[in-house]
Amino acid sequence: MNLQDHAGDIIRKARAMTDIPVETAAQAAGLTPDELAGLEETGVAPRKVNFKAVAQLVGVDGSKLEAVAGGWLPAARDLGLWRELRVVTTASQGMAVNCYLVWDEISREAALFDTGWDADPLFRLIQENDLQLRHLFITHSHHDHIAGVAAVKERFPKLRIHSGSRGAPADQRILANAFIHLGSLRLTNRETPGHSEDGLTYIIGNWPEDTPYVAIVGDALFAGSIGRGNLSWDLARQKVREQILSLPSDTLICPGHGPVTTVAEEKEHNPFF
C-alpha cells in the first residue's frame, strides 16, 4: 500500500502550518511557483528539488522528506501476529479509507473502529469468523470514516457506540482514558484533536503472547505524515507527539489512510517529528 501523502503533500501541509507563501517555498526548493504547485498536487517535479532547503523553511525534517520523495515505505507487517486484528479498506469519491475489526479469540466478542465507506465487507468478515459485534469506536466524525454507521446500527441494534464528538448522544460519548474490556483484550483511549475536534486514538493491549500494543489513530497520524490540521496544526502535531509517539516503540499504528506503521518508524522517518 502506498503512503497516504507524497512529498508534495507534506510540503503543502507544512506550508499551511507555517503560513509560507508558495513563491517563497518555490524559491527555496529551486522551482518556479507553478512547478511547486505541480509537485504539491502530484508528487512529481520536472527537475531536481532542494528538499532540505524547503523543509528547513517550512519546519520539517529535510532528510526524512528526501526519503519519502525517494520512495520510503514502512516495513511490511504481518498482522497475523495479532491474530484477531483485520484491516478493511473501502474506497469512494477517489479516497480509500481504513477501518479495523478486533476480537477476542475465546469469547468471539468483537469491536469495530470506524466503518469506512461501505459496511458490507465488514458484515462478511463478521459472519465468516462467527463474531459477536459489541462495540463501534469512532476515531473522528468525518464522513469517510462513518459513512457505514447507519448500516452497522441497523444490522446490530444492540451495538454500543463510542465517540468523542460533543454532538453525540450522551450515552455514546466516551470518557477520556476510560478502560473497556473485550474478552481478555483491554482498550483505552487518548484525545488526539487537531485534525478534528473530536479526534480519539484507541489503544488495545493484552494481546495473546504479549504481542505489542495496537494504536488506532484515525487521521491524527499517517505513515510518514499527519492529517490536515483542520482545527489546529500546532495542536495536531503536539497531540501526536504527546499521545501517540509516547507509546512503546513497537506499538503498531493503524491509521485511517495508508499503510500501518510503528511508533519507532514514525520517530525515525516522519518529517513532521
Give each language-model segment a name:
Residues 1-18:
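A short, Lys/Arg-rich alpha-helix, primarily the initiator
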Residues 196-273:
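Metallo-beta-lactamase
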Residues 30-46:
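Recognition helix of helix-turn-helix/homeodomain-like DNA-binding domains
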Residues 21-27, 54:
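Short alpha-helical "recognition helix" segments of helix-turn-helix
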Residues 30, 49-64:
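DNA major-groove recognition helix of helix-turn-helix/homeodomain DNA-binding modules
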